[in-house]
């Protein structure tokens, strides 16, 4: 085989392997403890583009007190969808100081956009109904290491 063809075949195999690796849930991201009032959240932290793009895709279950905190470099309008996401989720768009800007609920396997009402750096996903069951709404403040 010509050396260039070997290189192309190797590159294709590496890309195929990388793509296959995204077919499973992310379970080993760093974690942070967040609180609001007496409620404690054990949140996985997605900071890289790849981690944020995968998010909670492919998860079949998630304990009630767990979630995922998406951290972006700069505040901007953040929009989320539910492609390849099997769990119904609630999403909180969060200001730099931990104040929830707005909330939404998202249905599994849908492509509807759920967007922040203003530019934010943080987005917290929890099981659907988690925020409403705890009386948490826009204006509620989250406490924890990421927030100033």
Please provide the spans of the model-predicted regions.
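N-terminal secretory signal peptides that target proteins for export/translocation
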Residues: 1-3
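Sec-dependent signal peptide recognition
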Residues: 5-11
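N-terminal signal peptide c-region/cleavage motif recognized by signal peptidases
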Residues: 16-21
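Compact, glycine-rich, soluble single-domain proteins
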Residues: 22-148
């Amino acid at each position: 085989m010509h050396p260039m063809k070997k290189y192309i075949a190797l590159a294709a195999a590496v890309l195929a392997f990388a793509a296959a690796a995204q077919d499973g849930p992310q379970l080993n991201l760093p974690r942070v403890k967040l609180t609001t009032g007496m409620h404690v959240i054990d949140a996985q932290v997605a900071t890289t583009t790849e981690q944020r793009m995968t998010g909670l895709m492919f998860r079949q279950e998630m304990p009630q007190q767990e979630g995922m905190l998406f951290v972006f470099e700069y505040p901007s309008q953040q929009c989320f969808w539910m492609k390849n996401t099997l769990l119904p989720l609630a999403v909180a768009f969060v200001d730099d100081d931990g104040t929830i800007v707005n909330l939404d609920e998202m249905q599994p396997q849908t492509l509807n956009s759920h967007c922040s009402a203003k530019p934010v750096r943080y987005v917290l996903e929890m099981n659907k109904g988690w925020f409403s069951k705890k009386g948490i709404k826009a204006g509620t403040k989250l406490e924890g290491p990421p927030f100033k």
